[in-house]
Regions:
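Aromatic (Trp/Tyr/Phe) and Gly/Pro-enriched flexible surface segments
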Residues: 16-159, 163, 189-241, 252-317
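Interfacial segments of alpha-helical transmembrane regions
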Residues: 180-186
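Bacterial Sec-dependent N-terminal signal peptides
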Residues: 1-22
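Substrate-binding/catalytic groove segments of enzymes
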Residues: 174, 243-251
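A short secondary-structure junction signal
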Residues: 174-179, 208-212
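Extended, low-complexity, turn-rich repeat/linker tracts enriched in Gly/Pro/Ser/Thr and Asp/Glu
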Residues: 168-175, 186-191
Length: 318
């Protein structure tokens, strides 16, 4: 709840007038503040020391302590610590990078390999992702990736657009790969794209703890072309209600299929899917905002190694 309050009120001090619109920087959305986690992986997989980065107040945390989220930053990354059968392994696909006098964020699609006593036995494709929400650490398996997240933050406003700076680098191949770690690596048809995914939901919970949602607003964009120079003040309009017949609508803006639902923590403290059941009406107001920036789109463990997206100054326009 405190993150929703931070986003909805305290950012007013960071608002800027641009033309007739008022822009609010999402807290820590200038990516100038990073927390560092230093974790020793288990000896049986090499015992390497890994550095994981999180968008949060400057700090250094040493040791394999689970990290859910910051109490003041709404962001979480796909940088994560896993513990499987007592073995500690880290995955790193999000990085701070210098930009002018500050920093930006780079998300990158990578291949993570795990060797046990020098023998390769697990290879996983990992897209770099930042999002608003939390992560349930330590990760214990690769099943149902969405259930590892508490996706979204409390939010009741209705912005016109998301605005950000970006640049992109991609190999530009017309196929992707799928590598889950426990099965054969296979080719997947189609070019990979980075994705900026923003939805506003009106959520509610029934007496049994099930959570449902109406989709209030949608703003999704896929980027698949090399953009070597920064594109500043890029605007992504939020479409309210069913976007099907609205300008800017895309086929991938539909409601989330039940089997791919986001997850949240219900009032009983249990991680449950958020089932989208319809589009919002004109009188509906959102209860939650979910924003995700990823170097690859679509299902987990699918993408093109080498996709890189740099993002900076993520804000909401009103």
């Amino acid at each position: 709840l405190c993150l929703g309050i931070i986003l909805g009120t305290s950012v007013l001090s960071m608002a800027q007038m641009t033309g007739k619109e008022n822009e609010k920087l999402i807290p820590f959305g200038d990516f100038n503040s990073w927390m560092v986690r230093i974790i020793d992986e288990s000896f049986v997989i090499g015992g390497n020391t890994k550095t994981l980065y999180e968008v949060a107040p400057v700090d250094t945390i040493r040791g394999d302590k689970p990290y859910i989220s910051s109490t003041v930053s709404p962001w979480r990354t796909s940088n994560v610590m896993a513990k499987v059968s007592g073995v500690t392994k880290c995955s790193i696909s999000v990085f701070p990078e210098k930009r002018d006098d500050g920093y930006c964020v780079r998300v990158e699609t990578l291949m993570e390999k795990c060797k046990v006593l020098g023998i390769v036995n697990i290879t996983v494709l990992v897209p770099g992702t930042i999002y608003l929400g939390q992560m349930h650490e330590p990760i214990k398996d690769t099943k149902n990736p969405q259930s590892k997240l508490n996706a979204g933050i409390p939010f009741t406003e209705t912005p016109n657009a998301v605005v950000f700076d970006y640049k992109m680098e991609t190999p530009g191949t017309d196929h992707r790969i799928k590598a889950t770690g426990f099965s054969k690596i296979v080719d997947v048809a189609g070019r990979d794209s980075a994705e900026i995914y923003v939805i506003l939901q009106k959520r509610w919970e029934d007496k049994n703890g099930n959570v449902y949602a109406k989709r209030i607003g949608t703003a999704i964009e896929r980027l698949s072309e090399n953009t070597p120079d920064w594109k500043n003040d890029h605007r992504l309009n939020i479409l309210y209600g069913d976007p099907a017949n609205q300008a800017g609508s895309k086929s991938y803006m539909q409601l989330i299929p039940k089997e791919q639902s986001l997850y949240c923590i219900n009032s009983k403290g249990k991680s449950v899917p958020v089932e989208e059941v319809g589009w919002g009406d004109t009188d509906d107001k959102p209860t939650h905002l979910f924003l995700r920036v990823s170097s690859s789109y679509g299902e987990a463990y699918i993408g093109t190694v080498g996709n890189k997206l740099w993002v900076d100054n993520v804000r909401l326009a009103y």
